Swiss-Prot record:
Residues engaged in binding 3-phosphoshikimate: K20, S21, R25, S166, Q168, D312, K339
Binding residues annotated for phosphoenolpyruvate, in chain numbering: K20, G92, R120, Q168, R343, R385
Family to which the UniProt record says this protein belongs: Belongs to the EPSP synthase family.
CDD domains per UniProt: EPSP_synthase
Catalytic activity: 3-phosphoshikimate + phosphoenolpyruvate = 5-O-(1-carboxyvinyl)-3-phosphoshikimate + phosphate
Compartments reported by the entry: Cytoplasm
Keywords: Amino-acid biosynthesis, Aromatic amino acid biosynthesis, Cytoplasm, Transferase
Active site per UniProt: D312
Any one biological process term the GO annotation gives: chorismate biosynthetic process
The name this protein goes by in its record: 3-phosphoshikimate 1-carboxyvinyltransferase
Domain of life: Bacteria
UniProt cross-references to InterPro entries, sorted A to Z: Enolpyruvate_Tfrase_dom, Enolpyruvate_Tfrase_sf, EPSP_synthase, EPSP_synthase_CS, RNA3'P_cycl/enolpyr_Trfase_a/b
Pathway info: Metabolic intermediate biosynthesis; chorismate biosynthesis; chorismate from D-erythrose 4-phosphate and phosphoenolpyruvate: step 6/7
Top-level taxonomy: Bacteria, Bacillati, Bacillota, Bacilli, Lactobacillales
Length: 427
């Protein structure tokens, strides 16, 4: 598709879709809790729809009302064997978290994914879940999907140190541990997003968190809840970037999630000199209204324990770096190479083809700015975040046309992305 270029300014107010990470977990916990769960603000992107369909295939009743999703929870013991493989689509979150949950069931299930998901390593979950007593098998050394999970109703508790900073791996172990007799202890390499821990407590479960150590005793029973999901900071990130780098822009984003384990991007914006302010802060719901406007940015270094708190925002941060004065270094981000695509390579390829001075390193990128961007024919590589990064980058293009292949990948997390762009466009 041809992307909009030569933006004069973006202005207006916007509500981004519900948080993808929280939406997945809300559906999962609603299904395994006892009683009804009502979810408001759910993201209805393709990834979350895959999670919903998986639980329908496992015998859970899920239906929609005008503004909510209603789940009739069956408890941990109420899931039924699926009559066919569960299709996770493009969603690594769905596959890894469901593998953890299903590791304690008394039936076997096959988890499938699309071409992109079928290249993502699952050994990071098969190893700890196998230590607990489940049988999991994928393809090759890295246990690539399809993944067969043969559950065990008498899992063993484990003490496990995560070899990578991954909220998905942590969550898979926690979902298994909730069904396991005894205490499981997880030690994180770096602090990662804590939505699963928060949701366990929200549904009436108990766990203990001390720094990077999480302890949980099972088995537990959970109770259905009513949830309000905030807007996704990872989706808001693209509009925050647009507001900062498109001259004359002034944007207000309402009801954006600001969980502290996710706000690394906001800290980076401030360090780069971006004009950003917080309004209507709701500490209980961890949400706020964010206001940004066009800014003069400077290059910085991004590394260490900040990386897990902005891992999904690094593509758009790389775009910001192309419009910042000086050099921006992104380090310690090798996890980007095993996302929906190799995001280090994809980001440097796309922005490089558009004229940016950007080089890939083994664990990140080096970007020298400020550089003008020009037209190019590029691809999302099937990755929604690469697609949205490119659409925002195209707004700066004054010469040439930007064409984007496989733009449908954006439907994974932001079905109305281009509609929202039209709303903010000012000639």
């Amino acid at each position: 598709m041809k992307l909009k270029t030569k933006a004069k300014a973006l202005r207006g107010r916007l509500r981004v879709p519900g948080d993808k990470s929280i939406s997945h977990r809300a559906v999962i916990f609603g299904a395994i809790a006892e009683g009804q769960t009502v979810i408001h603000g759910l993201l209805r992107g393709q990834d979350v729809l895959a999670t919903i369909q998986a639980f329908r295939d496992l015998g859970v009743t899920i239906y929609e009302s005008a503004d909510s999703l209603i789940i009739e929870g069956r408890g941990f013991k109420g899931l039924k064997p699926a009559q066919k493989p569960l299709d996770m689509g493009n969603s690594g979150t769905s596959m890894r978290l469901l593998a953890g949950l299903l590791a304690a069931q008394d039936f076997s299930v096959q988890l499938l994914g699309d071409d992109s998901l079928s290249r993502r390593p699952m050994d990071r979950i098969t190893i700890p879940l196998s230590l607990m007593g489940a049988e999991l098998s994928g393809q090759g050394e890295k246990e690539l999907p399809p993944l067969i999970v043969k559950g065990c109703q008498e899992l063993r508790p484990i003490h496990y140190q995560l070899p990578v900073a991954s909220a998905q791996v942590k969550s898979a172990i926690l979902l298994a541990a909730l069904q396991t007799q005894g205490e499981t202890v997880i030690l994180e390499k770096e602090l990662t997003r804590n939505h699963t821990e928060e949701m366990i407590e929200q549904f009436g479960g108990k766990l203990s968190v001390a720094g990077k150590q999480i302890s949980i005793k099972g088995p537990q029973r959970l109770q259905g809840q009513t949830l309000q999901i905030p807007g996704d900071l990872s989706s808001a990130a693209f509009w925050l970037a647009a507001g900062l780098i498109v001259p004359g822009s002034d944007l207000v984003l309402e009801n954006v999630g600001i969980n502290p384990t996710r706000t690394g991007l906001l800290e980076v914006i401030e360090k780069m000199g971006g004009r950003i302010s917080y309004q209507a802060v709701d500490k209980d719901r961890q949400a706020a209204t964010l206001k940004v406007s066009y800014s003069t940015l400077k290059g910085i270094e991004i590394s260490g324990d900040l990386i897990p708190r902005l891992i999904d925002e690094l593509p758009v941060i790389a775009l910001l770096a192309t419009q910042a004065q000086g050099t921006t270094y992104i380090r310690d981000a090798q996890e980007l190479r095993v996302k929906e695509t190799d995001r280090i390579q994809a980001v440097t390829d796309v922005l490089g083809q558009m004229g940016a001075d950007i080089q890939a390193t083994e664990d990140g990128m080096v970007t020298r700015g400020k550089t003008p961007l020009h037209g190019a024919a590029v691809s999302t590589c099937g990755d929604h975040r690469i697609g949205m990064m490119t659409a925002i980058a195209a707004l700066l293009v004054e010469e040439g046309q930007v064409t984007l292949e496989r733009a449908e990948a954006i439907l994974t997390s932001y079905p109305d992305f281009f509609k929202d762009l039209e709303r903010l466009w000012h000639d």
